[in-house]
Amino acid sequence: MNAWEVNFDGLVGLTHHYAGLSFGNEASTRHRFQVSNPRLAAKQGLLKMKTLADAGFPQAVIPPHERPFIPVLRQLGFSGSDEQVLEKVARQAPHWLSSVSSASPMWVANAATIAPSADTLDGKVHLTVANLNNKFHRSLEAPVTESLLKAIFNDEEKFSVHSALPQVALLGDEGAANHNRLGGHYGEPGMQLFVYGREEGNDTRPSRYPARQTREASEAVARLNQVNPQQVIFAQQNPDVIDQGVFHNDVIAVSNRQVLFCHQQAFARQVQLLANLRARVNGFMAIEVPATQVSVSDAVSTYLFNSQLLSRDDGSMMLVLPQECREHAGVWGYLNELLAADNPISELKVFDLRESMANGGGPACLRLRVVLTEEERQAVNPAVMMNDTLFNVLNDWVDRYYRDRLTAADLADPQLLREGREALDVLSQLLNLGSVYPFQREGGGNG
């Protein structure tokens, strides 16, 4: 059956700021306390969506979450009106305010793990929300992510959206950022490659930075998503590269159809893994980048592998890269050699995503890939599909509500909370989502 990959991109939220919340993500740590520009961040993301949509790659948008997230501050013992809660936490424990104001939901590669209908036992598209257990600020995302996905994939005959796994370290799950699908045409059954960093009883794990994904979580997600057991491989990421800042697999590898583009040191037991994939995926092609040409450090600093590998109708592929790759002579030199070599990659497309990159999120972090048949695509909430009208509407919305300068101190401004709620109220109507945010369901108000 014919099917296409639709990229659902996360829209950057109004409180996008640099707080260095993500230990193990070196860009996040390096840019801590810099001044951010939420308006520019949102527009950079929108331009990527629109440019790819115009090039014939189906695109959709996933909206931001409510931030600062007052209910969690109340759980932490801060009381009073919303304004009083903000004032107290800013004075007594500003690190909590930064955490509950993170715009990290924009990296929707961590929102969920997807199983296309061609791979599932019941013939539905399955989406399992990620619990993002390893980082407090990200562990807050799952309930609203679930509401948003159910509002977008709202036809229960075609889509099953599963709640996140229990919030315990043993079941730490980071979503599609640690998941690859390999195969032929999108509508054919594919091989799902789940990548984990640690498993219970196995001492092979990183020592400097945390391994966020467990094998136990990956196995549970595969079960929830009803993936045919004959179409699953579990592989461990190389713990040495996690210790060099590769906090998700999508920082060291990207797949599309029959191609796996990865660093030579991406996986533990990589030779055996690639042999297994060759045996089980027709036409499988591994493009391994040698450490002598691109070091792991350079891969992390440029986000070479946090790229999007997109298929054209003729079978050729486009590699979507952040501007940092073009600015690094060694990486750009390698990429031009890659273009000239015998492989499906025929074009490099570069985007300026500096606002997201400075927090450790490149092109691939910003998108959730969902393979859909034509019938399934028709069943998606049409209001989220990117086109000329939506692009203009969202740019106007960003101009109206987003600030062009934000520091950690600004997060205590009650006006920022009010602006955010008003903006999301309007956005949920524009995207026909219903009441997906807690402030809407509580009768809301702005105070």
Swiss-Prot record:
Reaction catalyzed: N(2)-succinyl-L-arginine + 2 H2O + 2 H(+) = N(2)-succinyl-L-ornithine + 2 NH4(+) + CO2
Documented EC number(s): 3.5.3.23
GO-annotated biological processes: arginine catabolic process to glutamate; arginine catabolic process to succinate
Record pathway: Amino-acid degradation; L-arginine degradation via AST pathway; L-glutamate and succinate from L-arginine: step 2/5
Molecular functions (GO terms): N-succinylarginine dihydrolase activity
Keywords, alphabetical: Arginine metabolism, Hydrolase
Active site as annotated: E174, H248, C365 (nucleophile)
Pfam families the UniProt entry points to: AstB
Binding sites annotated in the UniProt record for substrate: 19-28, 110, 137-138, 212, 250, 359
Xref: NCBIfam families: arg_catab_astB, PRK13281.1
Functional note: Catalyzes the hydrolysis of N(2)-succinylarginine into N(2)-succinylornithine, ammonia and CO(2).
Family to which this protein belongs: Belongs to the succinylarginine dihydrolase family.
Subunit structure: Homodimer.
PANTHER family for this protein: N-SUCCINYLARGININE DIHYDROLASE
Official protein name in the record: N-succinylarginine dihydrolase
Species of provenance: Escherichia coli O17:K52:H18 (strain UMN026 / ExPEC)
Species lineage: Bacteria, Pseudomonadati, Pseudomonadota, Gammaproteobacteria, Enterobacterales
